[in-house]
Design a protein with these regions (language model features):
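C-terminal structural segments of small proteins and small subunits
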Residues: 65-97
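Short S/T/G/P-rich N-terminal loop/turn motif that feeds into the first structured element of a domain
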Residues: 1-62, 69-75, 102-105
């Protein structure tokens, strides 16, 4: 299983409604990509423990965790037209992002 992990910070000028719409579009589009086995979207939780949150160099408000079967499925997903369309939306709605892929087997 490969986890495609994306941390993202929406653009500061987006309203809450625009943020919600962009996230809903990402979620609904993911349902139509056959390689995706699991799609999870979450908002960052802060807890106030001294030193922990302050150690983070960059704030990312949301995380996407997308699971696919293997590296071949990941490549198909990343090269698919649906991913390119999502990338366009993603680029227009985010101020900062990180994406990494991990083998979870």
């Amino acid at each position: 299983m490969i986890a495609h992990v994306v941390l993202l910070q929406p653009r500061p000028d987006l309203t809450e409604g625009q943020r919600r719409a962009a996230l809903e579009t990402l979620t609904s589009a993911a349902a139509h990509v056959p390689e995706i086995r699991s799609f999870r979207l979450g908002r960052r939780v802060t807890h106030g423990l001294p030193g922990y949150e302050q150690a983070m160099k960059q704030d990312y408000e949301f995380a996407l965790i997308i699971e696919v079967d293997d590296v071949s499925a990941l490549k198909r997903y990343l090269q698919a037209p649906a991913h390119r369309a999502l990338g366009d939306l993603f680029s227009s709605a985010t101020a900062a992002a990180l994406a990494y892929d991990y083998d979870m087997t």
